[in-house]
Amino acid sequence: MEPKRRGDRFGRRGMLLGVLSATVLFLRVGNVNADISLPPVTVGVGVQTSAFSCSTSCIYSDGTVKQGDSNVQGFELDSIRLYINGSVTDNIKVTFNTEYNGSTDAVGVLDAIGRFEFSDKFNIWAGRFLPPSDRANLYGPYYANDWTPFADGVADFYPDIENGRDNGVAYWGQFGILKVQAGVFDGESLNSAVADKSRLLTAGRLTLDFWDPEPGYYFNGTYYGDKDLLALGLAGQNQNSKTAWNLDALMEKKLPNLGAVTVEAEYQKDNGLTSPAPNHGWYGLASYLFPQLVGIGKIQVLGKYSQKTVDAAALEDTATLELLATPEDKIKTTEINVNYIIKAFNARVGFYYLGQKDDIADTSKKEYGLKLQLQL
């Protein structure tokens, strides 16, 4: 029996030593971990959802068709986004944004950006992001003043691979009232229909902010009275001898009664960069934010009118290789909003009406509904 008791004693002693050793090791590792500081990371979420009714071919806020049938009513999760931003150092940062898109019922990578930001005048971005383009493309559906900014086909007409984004590298900097943005991107080189894929797309934008500045790479469609803004922008892109350019303007002024009036306009011209047939178009938008607080928010009214003209052209039939004459076509779009602004773009809800008429197709679309946007 004695050998067994001795073995038990040694076993208990060995077990005790093992526990003590593990405890000491844990404490040491814990002390090491306590000294490690992870890079700062922020996580955010954005949601857009709607209840709608349309006569035919309901349209998403990104301009794609929602439903092809007539007299459609329903609810839609238009979009949900996940935002992740982190800093490697004070000057090297990373952005990663994803989106579930209700128009495709799929999740895609919106932005994947390595951001090298050294000063107001010198910054380099590389990866997937919005190239220098029109103001509307650079604010997108979550920071637009209206609910369906791309339904007219005028705004955001530049080539892209994911909601206006493209893969490439860009420089941007601020010089007083002038912001300069320029870059090189894949563009149409991702499109198998383009014969010459050896040339990349070049893009550039100049923005003049005569009143308050707009810091950073991106823009807003409105600042809900937080800024007095008078901005003028010129953007252009070129690839394979095809060009597209636009001129845009935004004016926002807080009035003596603390209400805010906003006026936005854009003219665009596409010489075959994104469409076989050259086209041009324009839109004008005006909104007024009432100063009175109604409950937890303020009332805003908005109206927008746009017209896009697809030029007459001789296009090649891909099957027969014959040239087919296409007549000029005009597409006219009207949008009306009555919005309830709770916390700028982080919490807003609104009624919208969208009407669109196509002269050549001799069709008209009418859509109205309620939209909700939340961000954190």
What are these regions (language model features)?
Residues E214-Y217, G259-V261:
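Short, structured loop/turn "capping" segments at alpha-beta junctions
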Residues R13-G14, V29, F129, V349:
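Hydrophobic alpha-helical segments, especially transmembrane helices
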Residues M1-R12:
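N-terminal secretory signal peptides that target proteins for export/translocation
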Residues R5, L38, G68-S70, I113-E117, ...:
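Outer-membrane beta-barrel pore domains
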Residues L17-R28:
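Bacterial N-terminal signal peptides
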